UniProtKB/Swiss-Prot annotation:
Taxonomy, superkingdom: Eukaryota
Keyword Transcription regulation attached: no
LRR repeat positions: 260-285, 436-459, 614-636, 637-659, 682-706, 708-728, 729-749, 750-774, 796-818, 819-842, 861-887
Enzymatic class: hydrolase
Encoding gene, per UniProt annotation: RPS4
Domain TIR: 14-175
Span(s) of short sequence motif Nuclear localization signal: 1170-1177
Additional remark text: Only two amino-acid changes (D195N and H950Y) are linked to a change from a susceptible strain (cv. RLD) to a resistant one (cv. Columbia or cv. Landsberg erecta).
Single GO cellular component term: nucleus
Membrane listed as a keyword: no
Subunit structure: Interacts with EDS1.
Domain text: The TIR domain mediates NAD(+) hydrolase (NADase) activity. Self-association of TIR domains is required for NADase activity.
Official protein name in the record: Inactive disease resistance protein RPS4
Localisation per UniProt entry: Nucleus
Amino acid sequence: METSSISTVEDKPPQHQVFINFRGADLRRRFVSHLVTALKLNNINVFIDDYEDRGQPLDVLLKRIEESKIVLAIFSGNYTESVWCVRELEKIKDCTDEGTLVAIPIFYKLEPSTVRDLKGKFGDRFRSMAKGDERKKKWKEAFNLIPNIMGIIIDKKSVESEKVNEIVKAVKTALTGIPPEGSHNAVVGALGNSDAGTSSGDKKHETFGNEQRLKDLEEKLDRDKYKGTRIIGVVGMPGIGKTTLLKELYKTWQGKFSRHALIDQIRVKSKHLELDRLPQMLLGELSKLNNPHVDNLKDPYSQLHERKVLVVLDDVSKREQIDALREILDWIKEGKEGSRVVIATSDMSLTNGLVDDTYMVQNLNHRDSLQLFHYHAFIDDQANPQKKDFMKLSEGFVHYARGHPLALKVLGGELNKKSMDHWNSKMKKLAQSPSPNIVSVFQVSYDELTTAQKDAFLDIACFRSQDKDYVESLLASSDLGSAEAMSAVKSLTDKFLINTCDGRVEMHDLLYKFSREVDLKASNQDGSRQRRLWLHQHIIKGGIINVLQNKMKAANVRGIFLDLSEVEDETSLDRDHFINMGNLRYLKFYNSHCPQECKTNNKINIPDKLKLPLKEVRCLHWLKFPLETLPNDFNPINLVDLKLPYSEMEQLWEGDKDTPCLRWVDLNHSSKLCSLSGLSKAEKLQRLNLEGCTTLKAFPHDMKKMKMLAFLNLKGCTSLESLPEMNLISLKTLTLSGCSTFKEFPLISDNIETLYLDGTAISQLPMNMEKLQRLVVLNMKDCKMLEEIPGRVGELKALQELILSDCLNLKIFPEIDISFLNILLLDGTAIEVMPQLPSVQYLCLSRNAKISCLPVGISQLSQLKWLDLKYCTSLTSVPEFPPNLQCLDAHGCSSLKTVSKPLARIMPTEQNHSTFIFTNCENLEQAAKEEITSYAQRKCQLLSYARKRHNGGLVSESLFSTCFPGCEVPSWFCHETVGSELEVKLLPHWHDKKLAGIALCAVVSCLDPQDQVSRLSVTCTFKVKDEDKSWVPYTCPVGSWTRHGGGKDKIELDHVFIGYTSCPHTIKCHEEGNSDECNPTEASLKFTVTGGTSENGKYKVLKCGLSLVYAKDKDKNSALETKYDMLIGKSFQETSEGVDGRVKKTKGKYVMPVEKNFQETTEGVDGRVKKKKKTRMDNGRPKKKQRSGRDDNQTRMQVELQEGNINSVIMHTVKNF
């Protein structure tokens, strides 16, 4: 080094060495020599070049920096003259970034800002030295970072001997925070770095997914936005990456504060140190004291009051730790504005009342998860050529970790350098039990739980994804009451061991597997701990029989969860097997392969005289319970949930039994059930499911006591004829669907919100129907005896959905005010006159053979979005439709001839997606077809204009589609060909920012008129290619037809399918790739017809077409507009008649016709525009035409267009028209 630093040492330097980076012979002989002497007197090893003239090779010096623990970077006036000094500084920055080095800057007669901003002669020398060097940018970054670390300033007034002592103290303080080799327990030194104890290999992988996390956290800490002192909590489940995030934050922010400190591993430190040591450690760091064990905390507080402070507290686990630091935190809050405190914890409750805001660290997304896993799995060879062979397995491990960073690191590390066979073996082992290294992380949090919380955690694992109310009800018991159960759920939620989402209790997959591992360990110990049996091999294969026969083990079983789908062999239970299970709370025999639990072959044989003295049982689920009744010794005193679907039961139990806790009963499809007398005392019952209980004829009168019953399902109870008179005040949902002998419906609750009477034999609704003021849904589908709807329905002001489908005898709808109704289904009825429906959104009139026309007033239904007219075989015409209609289905309207002109109103701000279907409308007149195509064109134009204006067309989606009988591509399509494939050469700059979407057309023919389908879909694969690139194909929908409700139909005629879609994928790749280049582009389109999910060979695309749709520049007429296939202008919404290739006068303005692209020629003489002939395509390309000698006017018009004289062209055209 040119008069630079560092000594020659051949042996490996000892631990805790100091490297001095400096420039200048004068500095060496005086200040640096005194500093080296002082360091050595304090037993601190230091490296300095004693051989000024020859120095050391630079690579040796850089290696010494890597081996060092601390660097003293001494910035002096001549520092930037030396390339070696600056290259050393670059290396110092890299090492500090990696967390392997603590840097202490020393400003020798220079201001830190001079160094940081490269000012004055210091900066001039740097620019002169670095001129032309490609490393200049990295060097500037080093100068920007290192001086931002709090250092020591030596100015002209300083006493150098005192400053030397100050530097020695700072070095000693920093050394106390550096752990022994291999350890990661670093408490930051006074002038050090939070990552001092992080190995050099750790940095790279920790950045995966952390950039966005850091950005989000910094927004909550924003110093410009929040002027006062701010305390932020960083929370998340164990191993989620809180520590990594805090280290990144600390490293980025520490230079912005005059005092800063990170105290990590507070959970661990608190176990080995007295709590009063925590404030001593923190204050020592903040006060830059040589001895962090401060006895008098009052002395340095004034310093905190006067400075902006950054404090980072990591892994706080108990309130006492916060309380121990409270006094310092209060001083910081009351001190100078702008201080920041960050507290990381896995227990959110610790931050309550303490923090100003909370940042929750989320799981990594799939991309970052895969990167992190691959980094560790291939850490020694990131370019491993075989990595692609492991990709599928990698996906499996990433899926297993579910975005958990620590799990990804652990799994990747365990698989590093392992064969594919080992990877496969590891995956199979993980299916049985989690990695011990992952278990150990969660074990720390689990061990800190109380006994009640541990039981609650393990119980919840058995019922994850269930309703929160349900889980809390199961947990509530004599030893854990309702309040305690709620408290346990909240505590576990605060500790991120569970979470609640949409009212359900969820648990991360890793924690779920951990909970099972905890129970498995309990079974391998002395059996004294309560446990849950939930794996098939634990229960059947030498498990349950052994447990049930062992009195001590049986007494400690808390739950049995047996998936019957995994039982392969017949298994018999003895009548006495359950008598010793006095603590059993959860007994569940279920089938995971069938959610309806109806297809299980029960291979568990139960004796007739089974004993079941389960007094403590809360949850009893037994699929296909084989006995006629529960045993006499069964005691439901604590029973909360009873589920016995597809059972052989005739009644629950003999006689009356107390059921004070029973809230849920599900006996669905118990076809022999004939009595519900056992539920006479279930006064807290909330849900009762008796669907498919075909023998049940009546309800006991005692059911009127069920004042909390909110849900009653009697669907398919075909023997049920009536309900007793009662008032179930809490009942909200009543289902009587398919009760075919149920003739009279009594009003059993005024509070019903959803009432299903479909498929019943009722002929009329109750006289007091108006009492149902909360009724939202009334379903009377297929009530064939129903002849009229009472006028009292008009008084049901909350009613939103009325279903009268297939009420064959219903001919008249009452003249009532139903302005509140949103959904009205009248399909399959004989109603001829429509009611007033100002608010209806979904109207179904399909399969009505009586309706011949619709009321003209339907165009005023501004809320109407769906109109279903399928198979209205007498319908001959349709009026103008309202502007917000999104779906019109007129399939099979065989008498339909005409449509309104215009077909529907279009709003200037049109953004609605819409689909208009006229398939199998075989008598549709040509004028009607032309209006449909004209409407499609106007819809495309205005959709593009509105969406470009409102959201820039950033979302790729189908915006409009229609289909109708026909055999021609509409004339407004600019490119067309015969067949299913179209190739076009697009003009330069076709993909500029005005491109809003693409209009597509396909004429589809059925090769077999007798073929029947339930669905027909037309899609287009769009590919663009220029001179340099070929992009991935983009598939978009053109149109489709679906036979809803099952069944199939013929599509005999040829049909035209038109679709308009936004195309950001195509646009984006071109805009980003070559938006400024003037290159012609080829486009290739292939249209495909599918039936269901696969291509249908019985249908063929006869013709196809394409138009690109552009947004018109409203501020100016661009010369580029000459290339546009279709311009979007205000004039189009003003056109009252269809576009047929001529200019028409509309509201005092002239409208330019939609012209073809220049590859389609306009024939004319002397500037006159005639109806254009289509240029037919030969293999997707236009055939060449002989140029006429009378094309001068045509050419002149094109020149004027290119020069922007669009108005001249329009007037010239009109004049000659």
